[in-house]
Regions:
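Internal, hydrophobic cores of structured domains that mediate oligomerization or house catalytic pockets
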Residues: 2-12, 114, 119
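Glycine-rich, aromatic-bearing surface loops/beta-hairpins
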Residues: 118-185
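Short, hydrophobic/amphipathic alpha-helical patches that form generic packing surfaces
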Residues: 31-35, 68, 102-113, 146-154
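Short, surface-exposed, charged/polar-biased interaction segments
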Residues: 36, 40, 50, 70, ...
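A near-ubiquitous, low-amplitude feature marking generic local secondary-structure context
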Residues: 2-3, 12, 16, 87, ...
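Intrinsic-disorder-associated interaction segments
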Residues: 4, 8, 22, 42, ...
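Long, charge-patterned amphipathic interaction tracts in eukaryotic proteins
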Residues: 48-123
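N-terminal interaction modules that seed assembly of large macromolecular complexes
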Residues: 6-73
């Protein structure tokens, strides 16, 4: 088997395209981030949230979660999974935790704030997550609703840490170094 390396920019574009194809905009996710973080930072703007979502979506782990999750959702819509997995994914069975496991794994890189925020979003289904969780028109979003929650949780955590850095007067050079380290993985 020949090892094939897919260029990062292709993976990034594919992940963005999958979100768009499934009706999820970056603004939808930024709105959730705003709702999560505004109580802790009243100078927060939607543009800050959108920028944080964009940064989170640069991480390969997030991109891979999007690609895998959406692919499985689409296969379930086309009834192309074998049983009993087909029925489990198509119905978003309550005891099927693989969707949450993938999304939670994607949140682990952003620490405890991301993990607890993910749990909150998974339980309360805010914004576009609620729309995705509602089974209408034959669409399956078993994985995507949780992945969107993970992206929003990560962007929220990222903003919380940036706020602390600013409050403590952390130099721009150090903040940019942390920014670069976040893109690993």
């Amino acid at each position: 088997m020949t090892k094939v390396s897919v260029p990062s920019n292709e993976v990034t574009k594919a992940a963005h395209r999958k979100l768009e194809e499934r009706g999820v905009t970056l603004a939808d996710i930024a709105d959730i981030v705003y709702q999560m973080q505004f109580p802790y930072n009243n100078s927060l703007t939607l543009e800050d949230c959108l920028e944080s979502v964009r940064k989170v979506l640069l991480k390969r782990e997030i991109q891979h979660a999007i690609l895998v999750g959406v692919e499985l959702d689409q296969l379930a819509e086309r009834k192309m999974l074998s049983e009993p997995l087909q029925s489990i994914v198509a119905s978003d069975e309550g005891l099927f935790g693989v969707d949450e496991t993938i999304a939670l794994g994607a949140a682990l890189g952003y620490g405890s704030i991301a993990v607890t925020t993910f749990g909150h979003l998974d339980k309360n289904k805010i914004g576009i997550i609620q729309k995705l969780d509602t089974k209408e028109g034959g669409s399956v979003h078993t994985f995507l609703d949780d992945i969107v929650a993970s992206i929003a949780a990560n962007a929220s955590s990222r903003l919380a840490h940036r706020l602390r850095d600013l409050e403590e007067g952390r130099p721009l050079e150090e903040r940019l170094e942390v920014e670069g380290e976040e893109l690993i993985g």
